[in-house]
From Swiss-Prot:
Disulfide bonds join C428-C480. The active site is at D53. One of its GO terms (molecular function) is fructan beta-fructosidase activity. 6-fructan exohydrolase that can use phlein, levan, neokestose, levanbiose, 6-kestose, and 1-kestose as substrates. It comes from Arabidopsis thaliana (Mouse-ear cress). Its main location: secreted. Residues 1-28 form the signal peptide. GO terms for cellular component: apoplast; plant-type vacuole. Belongs to the glycosyl hydrolase 32 family. Substrate binds at W50, M51, N52, D53, Q69, W77, W113, S114, R179, D180, E235. It is an enzyme of class 3 (hydrolase). This is Beta-fructofuranosidase, insoluble isoenzyme CWINV3.
Length: 594
């Protein structure tokens, strides 16, 4: 069979997606028949079994790739984890591929754990990943594609040089705490750099730095890229540059140039949250220094203040943007996951960039979500009176995209925030919708049942504090995602999440965007300054029985400047149909030369 050119590939892929959409519709009906109300319509998930960390997202020859930690044996985590693999042309519709690789050699025989993809200067993708070796220690391995002409990269090979990075008595690295290599970056000296997460016995978190000229032979640097005491294990580190102007992304090897800051993200195993700092990378000393006010610990800002972990970014060189993925775990007991046959989602992919202040990252659903939009409802200039609730009719409330902008006029009516109120999640947990204040709670009720016995509320409260130095009133915006009434099933984790939003309501409107998808609610406050993701499992507010409301339970009225809500169509997510066959190169022997 002749190799397909780019146009033939595109035609074959369109045909495959058409057929796969038909298959997916049948599968969706089957899921409903099998009582699967919590499977999502447009969030990434395998057809079955367990999924956790996103691994090695990239774009290659016009095809987006997502690898992920996958247990092919069941709906709970298993040490024999493999690299699942799916591909897409738009980051919305996905085709399942065979696993990229499985435990198969001494350096990964007990599991192929998380890692990243690096695109070499010649365009060849290379995977660095953590393997659990025959001694159950953590080591770093490499995998390369068998056929670089295949845009779907369906076959990968493990060179005999594995493992490339190990622990020993000399380097003193704990073999149980040495994992998750990042995307590598190329220095001006021609050497590659990569960091691996670790920690010491006294809970110092580390980003261990390695260097290589050929991507095979790696040498540990004398000093880590960065460390912080009393933080515990740093999982899934991510280190990438961001532009100080505009929202365009920056290629990972763009280091030390004018107009660039760096972000170091770590996933702290002790809290199961993702924290980031913004700072400077000294390319001569190979150290990262957070900006003043940032510390790489629990005081750092989080990418998401809800159910969100092990995130990973990649640079999309086609659309000049950096895209963020994150694992969204279940909030249901394991027995429920086993019964339904699957566990774990990925957040909808987000564009991520540096705010113009240089002090925080902004996140927003990628623009491709708009291709799923259907029926639309628009409101303009409505008043939400104190204690009022308005229903939003005309959209599929269980699968929707909602944007609303609020304006508060009488800010002086805000309650005073106490100096001891420093924990936003605690404030949200103690002050549910029944606790009225001057300004708030106001926001959205999503996945609400007809009798309001079930609902998930995403809302704001505004407080004021007096600045004794300048004798000026400051306002504090609190964003909450309250799952306490989300389900009649009390076996679920129905924690309430909360965070402060860095906006000034005296000069700015208060905006909220919420993506609703059956069992996941992703919310973006203040234009993406604060993100909160939750998992919910209603018993009543399912499918057509789900409702959407806007509410104001405060004592003062709030203006809705605009509200736009869209029904979202289902995407094709990992149907059984594979990508079109492409004839392999004459030699099937992998080329291990970089």
């Amino acid at each position: 069979m002749a190799k397909l050119n780019r146009s033939n590939i595109g035609l074959s892929l369109l045909l495959s997606m058409f057929l796969a959409n038909f298959i997916t519709d049948l599968e969706a009906s089957s899921h409903q028949d099998l009582n699967q109300p919590y499977r999502t319509g447009y969030h990434f998930q395998p057809l079955k079994n367990w999924m956790n960390d996103p691994n090695g997202p990239m774009i290659y020859k016009g095809i987006y790739h997502l690898f992920y930690q996958y247990n092919p044996y069941g709906a709970v985590w298993d040490v024999r984890i493999v690299w699942g693999h799916s591909t897409s042309v738009d980051l919305v519709n996905w085709i399942s591929q065979p696993p990229a690789f499985n435990p198969s050699q001494p350096s990964d025989i007990n599991g192929c754990w998380s890692g990243s993809v690096t695109i070499l200067p010649n365009g060849k993708p290379v995977i660095l990943y953590t393997g659990i070796d025959q001694n159950k220690g953590q080591v770093q391995n490499v995998a390369v594609p068998v056929n670089i002409s295949d845009p779907y990269l369906r076959e990968w090979s493990k060179p005999p040089q594995n493992p490339l990075m190990t622990t020993n008595a000399v380097n003193g690295i704990n073999p149980d705490r040495f994992r998750d290599p990042t995307t590598a970056w190329l220095g001006r000296d021609g050497e590659w750099r990569v960091i691996v997460g670790s920690s010491t016995d006294d809970r110092r978190g580390l980003a261990i730095l390695y260097k290589s000229r050929d991507f095979f032979n790696w040498t540990q640097s004398m000093k880590p890229l960065h460390y912080e005491d009393l933080t515990g294990m740093w999982e899934c580190p991510d280190f990438f540059p961001v532009s100080i102007t505009g929202s365009d992304g920056v290629e990972t090897s763009s280091v030390g140039e004018n107009g660039i800051k760096h972000v170091l993200k770590v996933s702290l195993i002790e809290t199961l949250h993702d924290y980031y700092t913004i700072g400077s990378y000294d390319r001569e000393k190979d150290v990262y220094v957070p900006d003043l006010g940032f510390v790489q610990n629990e005081s750092a800002p989080r990418l998401d203040y809800g159910k969100y972990y092990a995130s990973k970014t990649f640079y999309d060189d086609v659309k000049k943007r950096r895209i963020l993925w994150g694992w969204v775990n279940e909030s249901s007991p394991a027995k429920d996951d086993i019964e339904k046959g699957w566990s774990g989602l990925q957040s909808f992919p987000r564009k991520i960039w540096l705010d113009e202040s240089g002090k925080e990252l902004l996140q927003w659903p990628i623009e491709e979500i708009e291709t799923l939009r259907g029926q639309q409802v628009n409101w303009q200039k409505k008043v939400l009176k104190a204690g009022s609730t308005l229903q939003v009719h005309g959209v599929t409330a269980a699968q929707a995209d909602v944007e609303v902008s609020f304006k508060v006029k009488e800010l002086e009516k805000a309650d005073v925030i106490e100096p001891s109120w420093t924990d936003p999640q605690k404030i949200c947990s103690q002050g549910d919708l029944s606790v009225m204040s001057g300004l708030g709670p106001f926001g959205l009720m999503v996945l609400a049942s007809n009798d309001m016995e079930e609902y998930t509320s995403v809302y704001f409260r505004i407080f004021k504090s007096n600045d004794d130095t300048n004798k000026k009133t400051k306002y504090v915006v609190l964003m909450c995602s309250d799952q306490s009434r989300s389900s009649l099933n009390d076996e679920n984790d129905k924690s309430t999440f909360g965070a402060f939003v860095a906006i000034d309501p005296s000069h700015q409107t208060i905006s909220l965007r919420t993506l609703i998808d059956h069992s996941i609610v992703e919310s973006y406050g203040g234009g993406g300054r604060t993100c909160i993701t939750s998992r919910v499992y209603p018993k009543l507010a399912i499918g057509e029985n789900a409702n959407l409301f806007v509410f104001n339970k405060g004592t003062q009225s709030v203006d809705i400047l605009t509200l736009s809500a869209w029904s979202l169509k289902s995407a094709q997510i990992n149907g059984d149909l594979m990508s079109p066959f492409i004839e392999r190169e004459e030699s099937r022997s992998p080329n291990h030369q970089f």
